Amino acid sequence: MAKNVVVIGAQWGDEGKGKIVDWLAEEAGGVVRFQGGHNAGHTLVVGGKKTILRLIPSGILHESLDCFIGSGVVVSPEALLGEIDELNAAGVKNVEGRLKIAPTCPLILPYHIALDQAREASRGKGKIGTTGRGIGPAYEDKVARRAIRAADLLHPEKLREKLDAVFAYYNVQLQHLHNAESVKAEDVMAVIEKVAPRITPMITDVSRVLNEKNKNGEKLLFEGAQGALLDIDYGTYPFVTSSNCLAGAASAGAGVGPQMLDYVLGIVKAYTTRVGSGPFPTELFDEVGAGLAERGHEFGSVTGRARRCGWFDAAALKRSIQINGISGMCITKLDVMDGVETINICVGYELPDGGKTDILPCGSDAVEACKPIYETMPGWSESTFGVKSYDALPANAKAYLKRIEEVCGAPVAIVSTGPDREETIVLHHPFA
């Protein structure tokens, strides 16, 4: 029987999922994106060469591997084709032949982007921190049952009628609520006519193919985007993304039964980061935080925005472990902690009423009111960069990892000590 693995970000995103998915893909028969859009990038380094993927699964660099975009993903056709062109230019073989898109994927079109950007501009100081790429409005259309989906590209004779109804809805909002320019039907149709000939050959019944692969004993790898603490239901709402980022979303977003999900690997940075607005209890505003940002190259791969940095938040991670059923953790960027003399781990929070909790509360207001409770540990001066053996790690680094396990209640399965595929320590292989 095949063993299937779900990879999710266990913090606020940017944990290093792309590298680990690329590494695990060596043993997979298919890699599947199941939620999100092109609002976050996954950075891969293979042989010193960097590749940034936004929509295409991180297994695409393995040139015999099939990759899938499930119905839980909102797809910008223009962004997708741009990404394919980048991979083709880099010499990656048969990208369009190996990439399959579910017919039920909602499409991101110019009016989604226009509304997303107009809304964010009108929020003033209350900005959520959206990337302005149309992700939220596309998910709104899905729920409101007015989405244009990938399958609609196969029926151009019916598509224009659907679009006319959508234009009326969007242009009222753009013009009258946000004082922005309307979107012209001919501009959107021009985009669709340009992308459809390349998109339609990739449209496939993804759910059926994945289930067939599973029956044939092939291992499947489900790749999440963003992070659990940005989940639309369980994140620090409203400072969240527009989709469910949890392991459970892999089932609905890919079209497989939950019994097919055997192992949940939570990707966890050795410190904590967050992009954009929203509460962040362990955020650092001193030279330690600046040092983490500099050594960790903490800038968004898609937006270029600087990431906020802070101490490891075990209480937040406990919430993520709980809501995802994490089987094992992969600790990334351990090498960024090299040289930090004294390390703090947040093990809980003081609450406004004088009480304490050892797990992240629900909602941004409750999290904003939390004051972190720290345990202090000695750091290490030795370099962990590129170390490939657990025994070769400094004693204090091993003690740090052990304490994370103890406080969070989940085992460390993998340790990443650098951006390259090979800079990885394996304690327990998720596919084993």
UniProtKB/Swiss-Prot annotation:
Q: Where is the active site?
A: 14 (proton acceptor), 42 (proton donor)
Q: Where does the record say this protein resides?
A: Cytoplasm
Extract the Gene3D superfamilies matched here. Answer: Adenylosuccinate Synthetase, subunit A, domain 1, Adenylosuccinate Synthetase, subunit A, domain 2, Adenylosuccinate Synthetase, subunit A, domain 3
Q: What catalytic activity does the UniProt entry give for this protein?
A: IMP + L-aspartate + GTP = N(6)-(1,2-dicarboxyethyl)-AMP + GDP + phosphate + 2 H(+)
Quote the record's binding site residues for Mg(2+).
14, 41
What cofactor does this protein call for? Mg(2+)
What GO CC terms are in its UniProt record?
A: cytoplasm
Keyword GTP-binding, does the record have it?
A: yes
User: Which GO molecular function terms does the record list?
Assistant: adenylosuccinate synthase activity; GTP binding; magnesium ion binding
Cofactor note text? Binds 1 Mg(2+) ion per subunit.
- Biological or metabolic pathway of the protein: Purine metabolism; AMP biosynthesis via de novo pathway; AMP from IMP: step 1/2
- Binding residues for GTP: 13-19, 41-43, 307, 333-335, 416-418
UniProt entry keywords in alphabetical sequence: Cytoplasm, GTP-binding, Ligase, Magnesium, Metal-binding, Nucleotide-binding, Purine biosynthesis
Q: What biological processes does GO assign it? A: 'de novo' AMP biosynthetic process; IMP metabolic process
Keyword GTP-binding in the entry? The reply is yes
**Protein family (similarity comment):** Belongs to the adenylosuccinate synthetase family.
The protein, known as: Adenylosuccinate synthetase
Organism, by scientific name, is Neisseria meningitidis serogroup A / serotype 4A (strain DSM 15465 / Z2491)
